[in-house]
Amino acid sequence: MDREYGTFQKPKKVRIVVEKCPKNEAGRACHCHEVGQVFTFDFEQCPQDFCAAAFHSLWPQLRVLELGGRHPWDSQEGVTRVACPDPGKPTIFRIETYEED
């Protein structure tokens, strides 16, 4: 790598898809997200209307995929799943890279 100019690959486009929103013991699901919602991540900021606590837990995984990495537990390249930190109703997010048309 050339430290003066950098020879980094262009970051990949990443989107976040809400896969599961389980209900807690009181029968309430996540108040921020619904199954099927899709958010585009642009590295600059948390997507609008996205739960800040969930985003904080997704951030490291977003960066791994954006920079072309892969976790040892991922079965598919460019895709990982992460749960929000709410222990009562952990929303599951699929993070995936994509090509822009």
Give short role names for the model-derived ranges.
Residues 21-23, 44-49:
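Short, charged beta-turn/beta-strand-edge "cap" motif at the junction between a beta-strand
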Residues 67-101:
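Short, compact, well-ordered microdomains
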